[in-house]
Swiss-Prot record:
Spans traversing the lipid bilayer: none
Keywords annotated in UniProt: Ribonucleoprotein, Ribosomal protein, RNA-binding, rRNA-binding
GO CC terms in record: cytosolic large ribosomal subunit
Family to which the UniProt record says this protein belongs: Belongs to the universal ribosomal protein uL18 family.
Lineage: Bacteria, Pseudomonadati, Pseudomonadota, Gammaproteobacteria, Pseudomonadales
Protein function: This is one of the proteins that bind and probably mediate the attachment of the 5S RNA into the large ribosomal subunit, where it forms part of the central protuberance.
Protein name: Large ribosomal subunit protein uL18
InterPro entries: Ribosomal_uL18_bac-type (IPR004389), Ribosomal_uL18_bac/euk (IPR005484)
UniProt entry tagged with the keyword rRNA-binding: yes
GO MF term set: 5S rRNA binding; structural constituent of ribosome
Length: 115
C-alpha cells in the first residue's frame, strides 16, 4: 500500500467519525507549494468558508512554509467566524499533526476558532 493510500485510509476513518458527531469540520489539504483550508458541513455537502495561500492577501510571500500556514489559519478562522461558526472538528486529512498542519491549527485556535 502506498503512503498516499494509507493517508487516504486514515482520512476516511476520521471523516466518518466526524460525520457521526454532526459538527462542522475544518478540512486541511497541503501540497508542496500551497496550503488549503475549508470549513464544510458535517456531511460535506456544503462549503461554508475557505482560505488558501492562493488568496490575493496571501499570494505575495512564500506559500509553502509554516508562516504561510499560520496566515491561512488566521484567515480561515476570521471567515468562519464571519459565517457564524464558532466550533468545528479538525480534519487533518490523514496528514501528521506536525509542521504546516500544526501551524494552521494553532493559528486558527488563537484567532478564536474552537476544536
Amino acid at each position: 500500500m502506498s503512503a498516499n493510500n494509507e493517508r487516504l485510509r486514515r482520512a476516511r476513518k476520521v471523516r466518518m467519525k466526524i460525520r457521526e458527531l454532526g459538527t462542522d469540520r475544518l478540512c486541511v489539504h497541503r501540497t508542496p507549494r500551497h496550503m488549503y483550508a475549508q470549513v464544510t458541513t458535517a456531511d460535506g455537502s456544503k462549503v461554508l468558508a475557505t482560505a488558501s495561500t492562493l488568496d490575493k492577501e496571501l499570494r505575495q510571500g512564500a506559500t509553502g512554509n509554516v508562516d504561510a500556514a499560520k496566515k491561512v489559519g488566521q484567515l480561515i478562522a476570521e471567515r468562519a467566524k464571519a459565517a457564524g461558526i464558532e466550533k468545528v472538528a479538525f480534519d487533518r486529512s490523514g496528514y501528521r499533526y506536525h509542521g504546516r498542519v500544526q501551524a494552521l491549527a494553532d493559528a486558527a485556535r488563537e484567532a478564536g476558532l474552537q476544536f
